[in-house]
From Swiss-Prot:
Protein's name in the database: Elongation factor P
Protein's cellular compartments: Cytoplasm
Organism name: Mycobacterium tuberculosis (strain ATCC 25177 / H37Ra)
Gene3D superfamilies reported for this sequence: 2.30.30.30, Nucleic acid-binding proteins (2.40.50.140)
Encoding gene, per UniProt annotation: efp
Pfam families in UniProt: EFP, EFP_N, Elong-fact-P_C
Amino acid sequence: MATTADFKNGLVLVIDGQLWTITEFQHVKPGKGPAFVRTKLKNVLSGKVVDKTFNAGVKVDTATVDRRDTTYLYRDGSDFVFMDSQDYEQHPLPEALVGDAARFLLEGMPVQVAFHNGVPLYIELPVTVELEVTHTEPGLQGDRSSAGTKPATLQTGAQINVPLFINTGDKLKVDSRDGSYLGRVNA
């Protein structure tokens, strides 16, 4: 059991028999009325995202989630294979479970896999990943009215928007949560 004061990103709640993870939360203290907590919850199994409001101080059931450090090894058909860093056991995870994170997965990348009762639930990439640009059009100085962006393809096949000065072969820092450009990696 946890109260709303214990809420943090990544906490897994049990609501109506289903597992939900908190992706965003905000404590709100209005001028009139009681305080409450506004949350954005993601269903661990289906990936569905919902907004839910809790009254301050309410007790909520939490799930025991074991996060293990793993390394992404390779893709085998529709499965992604991860190796546990503790016991070197390999865990093939289906594409549906890996989800959007597959866009930024590189072989040898350290990844956390969350388990509940021995069953893998989801993976957590590092917040920032370093990837190389494999293709982008050259940006011309006079082709915009204000600072602009252009599409770039990364070595994993993911496409993101980057500033015009980025060239093919540049190594970039990318936010793995939303795919946004964070900067160039100094070589």
